[in-house]
Amino acid sequence: MRSRDIRRKYGQNYLTDKSVLFKMADAISPTSSDNFLEIGPGLGALTEQINKDDINIIAIDIDSENTEILKNKFTGPANFQFLTDDILKYKIENDRQRIVGNLPYNISTQIILKLIDSCENCLLYTSPSPRD
C-alpha cells in the first residue's frame, strides 16, 4: 500500500492494524450482492478486506488524491465506484446499504447523525473512535 501524509484538515486516520481490519471484515462478513457505502476509504485497507467479486461498493472520500489512488488500485471490478465528495453533503440514495468505514474523527458524530436521518434500513460498521 502506498503511504502518504495524513491531512489533518480532513480528520484522516488511516487504519493499518491488520488485526483490527481482519476483525472488522469478519464482523461485516460480506455476502453475495451486498451493497456497501464506504465512508473515508483512505488508501483502501478495509476495501481490500471486504472485496468480493459480487458485491457493490461506493467509496466516498473527500480527498481527491485518495480517490485517484483507489481508482488505480482497484482497476478490475466494475461494481466499485470511487467518488470524491463530502459525505455530509452526499445524498444517500439506497437506504438498504451496509455502511462501513474508519470515520474521520473530526466529523464522526455528524456522520452518524446524518445516517440516522437518511437510512432507515442501513447497517453501520465502523472502527472505534479515540476518547476525547
Model-derived segments and spans:
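Catalytic cores of RNA-modifying enzymes
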Residues: 1-127, 131
